Design a protein with these regions (language model features):
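A common structural junction motif
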Residues: 80-88
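A short, exposed loop/beta-hairpin motif centered on an aromatic-Gly-Thr core
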Residues: 61-64
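Short S/T/G/P-rich N-terminal loop/turn motif that feeds into the first structured element of a domain
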Residues: 1-59, 69-77, 90-112
Length: 112
């Protein structure tokens, strides 16, 4: 389903999350976290995740697109608890609405 097919039945939401990270980076990160990525891919309501990393500033995180706010909030509650249990501190979390009309103009390829 594309943005044009969606209608107004769902309100897409974006989650931006980043935190201090000391590596691994690049392909080493991909190898180490591929199982986690597969589990995240199965999260209910998740459309996609873009993995982010910045070795220069020692940060990693992601940009997540969810079908709706309830799905985002459900994922976020569990994610924060898991990160705390792992001793990860300094997590920055921001939630955004998606302007679907402008996203279509700029070739946003959002599908479910």
């Amino acid at each position: 389903m594309t943005l044009a097919d969606r209608g107004d039945s769902l309100a897409l939401k974006v989650l931006q999350m980043d935190y201090p990270f000391s590596g691994p980076w690049g392909s080493e990160m991909a190898e180490e976290y591929s199982d986690l990525a597969r589990r995240i891919a199965d999260v209910p309501g998740l459309v996609c995740k873009v993995w982010t990393e910045n070795p220069g500033t020692g940060e990693a995180g992601g940009i997540y697109l969810f079908e709706d706010e309830a799905s985002l909030d459900s994922y976020l509650a569990g994610k924060i608890e898991r990160m705390k249990a792992l001793g990860i501190e300094g997590v920055r979390v921001r939630k955004f609405d998606v302007n679907e009309d402008l996203t279509q103009i700029t070739r946003g390829r959002i599908s479910e």
